[in-house]
Every structure is written in structure tokens, then in C-alpha cells.
């Protein structure tokens, strides 16, 4: 029995529709598969031992991931990778270039790297806000009182996005200290960090570096100014030491996140004019191999790089 004319017409049309739908979704399907691979591959960068290789490779990696995100803009894995990636790129590399220019007193380069750092951390913040939703996007730059309610209502599933938003906003402020309106957002950064630490008291994140980062951020906030202008060396030291404790283990009781010790030695040494503390802490960093924490080898290479730089300028810093 031959199929009816209507059935013979419907079947090819249905097949054509399926093919077209498949073609429309093929890009997203490919990206979603790739995103899973990228998440699994992320530790390879964190374990990199060659600073310059990572410095040169990360921008291209981020732009590739951003291209995938453009195809699938709702992909949470890609947004998470971009959030962390831009914050880490800004901290490890762009700020390092900025700091090199500062010590060399190259004013044009200082200005250029300063502006670039602002742009990079703004990208990190924007991706974090995509994860955190409309209320955060609406109220982050509103009054601290209104925003505090939004932060308080944000649950533990958004803990990491909150952390990156605080680190990004704090870094943006740090690179725009001459803009009074930016300084007004310091209470907002503290609100976010307080909420993250409140969540951490109930349940620490599985990654020790994630547990330590809010304390590093607070250490930097408390050491950002002298005691005369609101800085608190005692509180900053406590926060840095907490970060080190959270990354310690029986084999390495002094902590494995060397960047926390580098920042503590440099910032508190200058803040309190304690040259011995400055020297001893940075010397301890250099006496600890970066491989002490293989999973965070790159961060420890950054710590060594900065410790060497600070010690090379010790005499002029304590004139």
C-alpha cells in the first residue's frame, strides 16, 4: 500500500525541520561539551611553573573561552571560568606589570597598566554579577544599607561568585584611589566579604585557596592605610595569618599560600616601619620552594617573583 500524498509531504518536511533544529543547536551543544573539558583542564594553569608562559598564554585562553560564551551566553561553567580567569589574570599579571612600572618610576606605563587593571577587574566583576543576578546588578552600587539586605539573602551556592565580586571591586577601588566616589564603595566590599566569611563559618569551601582568599582580601584592606587614616596592622596580620593557617597541612604548618606571606611581609613591614619583619617574612617566602603546593604552583611563583622584587628595593623602602 502506497503512503498518501500528505504523508509523503509531511515526512520530508519533518526531517528537514529536525535537521535545521540540529544545525541551530549544534554550536551550543559543542560549546557545552567543550565547557566541561575546560573546567577539568583549568588546574593545568594553576599548576604552571613558568611564570612568563602563563603570562603570555592566559589572555588568549580567556578570549577563546569568551568566544565560546558568546555562542552560549547562559553557560554557567563558562561564566564561572571567565570570572575567576579575569580576576586571576588581573592579580597575577596586570598588577605585576603595574608594580614593575611603579618601582621603575615610569609614569606613562604606570598610568597605562593602572587603566588596564581597572578594565580587567571590571570584566571579572561583570561576569560575577551575571552569576549573582538582577538584585546584585541593581543594588551593588546603591546604598550600603540596601545592598546589605541583598548580600544577606544570597545563599551558599553563590559563595564563590560573591568572593570574586568583592576581590574585583576592591581591586578596582585600589586602582582608582584618586576618585572619591570609588572610595565610597569600600563598605560594600566589606559587606560582601563579611557574608562570604559568614557562610564559611557554616561550611568551608572544599578548596583551601578559596577559603583563604577572603582573608587575604581583608588583610589588604586593613593594611591599605596607616593607622592615622584607619589602617589596622594587628587585624591585617591576623587575617594574613588566618589565610596561611587555612592552607597549612602537617608537612607544611606555616602555610602553603606563599602570596599571603609575601603580602603580609611587604605591606605590614612598610605600614609599621618594621624592616626586620619585612625582611624575615620575604626571606621565608624565598626559602620555601614554590612546589610546596603543586596545585597552586603559579600563585607561589608569583609570590616568589614579588618577594624578590621587594627585597631588591628594601634599602630604598626603609630610608
Predicted regions and their residues:
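Acidic-aromatic/histidine active-site loop/patch
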Residues: 307
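Bacterial N-terminal signal peptides that target proteins for export
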Residues: 1-11
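Extracytoplasmic and endomembrane cell-envelope/extracellular-matrix remodeling and assembly machinery
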Residues: 312-319
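Bacterial Sec signal peptide processing site at the extreme N-terminus
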Residues: 21-45
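Short coil/linker segments at helix-helix boundaries
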Residues: 36-67, 71-72, 85-202, 210-247, ...
Amino acid at each position: 500500500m502506497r503512503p498518501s500524498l500528505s504523508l509523503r509531504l509531511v515526512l520530508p518536511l519533518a526531517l528537514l525541520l529536525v535537521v535545521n533544529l540540529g544545525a541551530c543547536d549544534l554550536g551550543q551543544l559543542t560549546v557545552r561539551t567543550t565547557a566541561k573539558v575546560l573546567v577539568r583542564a583549568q588546574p593545568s594553569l594553576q599548576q604552571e611553573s613558568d611564570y612568563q608562559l602563563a603570562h603570555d598564554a592566559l589572555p588568549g585562553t580567556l578570549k577563546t573561552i569568551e568566544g565560546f560564551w558568546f555562542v552560549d551566553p547562559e553557560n554557567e561553567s563558562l561564566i564561572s571560568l571567565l570570572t575567576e580567569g579575569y580576576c586571576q589574570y588581573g592579580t597575577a599579571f596586570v598588577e605585576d606589570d603595574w608594580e614593575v612600572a611603579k618601582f621603575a618610576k615610569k609614569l606613562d606605563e604606570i598610568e597605562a597598566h593602572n587603566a588596564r587593571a581597572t578594565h580587567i577587574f571590571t570584566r571579572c566583576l561583570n561576569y560575577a554579577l551575571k552569576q549573582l543576578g538582577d538584585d546584585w546588578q541593581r543594588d551593588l552600587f546603591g546604598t550600603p544599607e540596601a545592598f546589605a539586605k541583598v548580600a544577606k539573602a544570597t545563599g551558599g551556592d553563590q559563595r564563590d561568585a560573591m568572593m570574586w565580586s568583592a576581590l574585583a571591586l576592591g581591586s578596582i577601588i585600589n586602582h582608582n584611589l584618586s576618585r572619591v566616589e570609588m572610595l565610597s564603595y569600600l563598605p560594600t566590599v566589606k559587606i560582601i566579604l563579611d557574608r562570604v566569611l559568614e557562610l564559611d563559618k557554616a561550611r568551608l569551601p572544599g578548596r583551601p585557596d578559596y577559603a583563604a582568599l577572603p582573608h587575604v582580601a581583608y588583610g589588604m584592606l586593613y593594611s591599605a592605610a596607616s593607622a592615622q587614616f584607619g589602617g589596622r596592622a594587628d587585624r591585617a596580620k591576623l587575617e594574613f595569618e588566618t589565610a596561611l593557617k587555612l592552607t597549612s597541612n602537617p608537612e607544611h604548618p606555616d602555610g602553603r599560600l606563599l602570596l599571603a606571606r609575601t603580602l603580609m611581609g611587604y605591606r605590614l613591614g612598610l605600614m609599621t616601619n618594621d624592616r626586620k619583619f619585612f625582611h624575615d617574612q620575604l626571606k621565608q617566602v624565598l626559602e620555601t620552594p614554590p612546589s610546596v603546593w603543586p596545585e597552586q604552583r603559579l600563585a607561589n611563583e608569583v609570590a616568589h617573583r614579588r618577594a624578590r622584587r621587594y627585597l631588591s628595593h628594601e634599602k630604598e623602602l626603609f630610608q
